Amino acid sequence: MTNKVVRKLEQASCVEAGPRGLRVLSPGRILNLWATERRLQGEMWKSLRIDDLASAEADLPRDVILTAFSGWATHAKRRPAEYARIHFYVTDKTAFESWMEFRRDKVRRTNPNIFALEAHDLHLVNTSSRGVVCVPQIYVDIYAADGPEAQPFLKDIVASFPALALW
């Protein structure tokens, strides 16, 4: 008997369940299935707008973990496309609130371009490195964030990590 998650992965031809456990057939398919079901809004803690996005990104507090476009740009040290949004996970809400308070005169609430997500998953924090989430998480968050800049970023990730491709 298999649970509904394993059944779903079997139906998508991602895994094969047998008496000795699971065999992963396609890591890329698992990643893309996760990406299509991912909803960033569910983890959104704060959203705001700071017009000078580049300086805000460079000046983020130490206890945030970059993801999505800025996460890949930091990890790969290149930008496959220009982006106008920053997504990151906040590990210390009090410190982030202080960071926001210091920039209060620059912060607007309309048309947000900075998205702070809750880092409630200890695994997410433990698998991050140098203030950036792991590559599969970056891929999934870019896919979920969508927008015109998403496709060049996703293609660049797959070119750098072919195991993440669908086929």
Residue spans for each PLM region:
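Long, low-complexity, charge-rich intrinsically disordered regions
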Residues: 39-167
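Short acidic, glycine/serine/threonine-rich loops at helix termini
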Residues: 36
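Loop-centered beta-sheet repeat module
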Residues: 1-33
